[in-house]
Structure formats: structure tokens, C-alpha cells
Amino acid sequence: MAAAVIEENGRYLIARRRGDAPLAGFWEFPGGKRRAGEALEACLRREVEEEVGAIVQVGDLIDRAVQPYSHATVDIHFFRCRLAQGAPRALGCEEVRWVRAAELAGYRFPDANASVIARLAAAS
């Protein structure tokens, strides 16, 4: 899996998972599952466009987390990204928000996001 850590003007883009998805209602950084043979960066560009309707430029890998859940074990690669085109909006998610790093802890994220959230908060 790949997730986009998109920062703009000191805020990060987060998306709330749909009610019919695993971990429904939790917040996450936009992204998703990689298809067979797909590069992580290509996966991330595709998933962000499907989920929030924006095109991103994928930068450096900033964190990775392997986390077991009741429905699956996930291996998420978090990439620093920047918006290249489009204004994010909820397409494949319930809602999107721009929040400061210090505010991320106030949102309910899946456990796999804990280390990247701590890293962002420490850097702010």
C-alpha cells in the first residue's frame, strides 16, 4: 500500500474512510492498495486521483509501517507528496480536511499511521 503525505501551507490533507470500508470512519492520508506489477509511486498517483480527484507529484519515502488488523496485515509506504493539479474533494472517501500536524492526534487514525503522525508533529 502507499499513502500520500500532502503538505500545503503548513497543513496536511487527510481523508475519512467510507462507512462500507474496513476501518470505516477512521481518518487516513490518501492512498490505497497497489495492483499487481504496479510501482508504489504509480499506485499512489492513481489512488489519490481516484480518492480525492487531485494529481500529485510523489516525493521521498518518509515512513513505512507494517500493522496487523483483524481483516488483514497492511504494509504502508508513506511518501511526501505535493499537489500538482486539482483541488482535493471527497470522491472515494466521506470527507477531506486540511489540518496542521499538531491537530492530527485529535483525529482517529488506524494504528499504522502512528509513527508518521508522531514524526510530522515532532517536525512542526
Where in this protein do the model-derived segments appear?
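The catalytic Nudix box helix
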Residues: 29-61, 100
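Active-site-adjacent beta-strand/loop module that shapes the phosphate/pyrophosphate-binding cleft
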Residues: 55, 64-89, 95-97, 101
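Charged phosphate-binding loop/patch that engages nucleotide di/tri-phosphates or the phosphate backbone
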Residues: 112-124
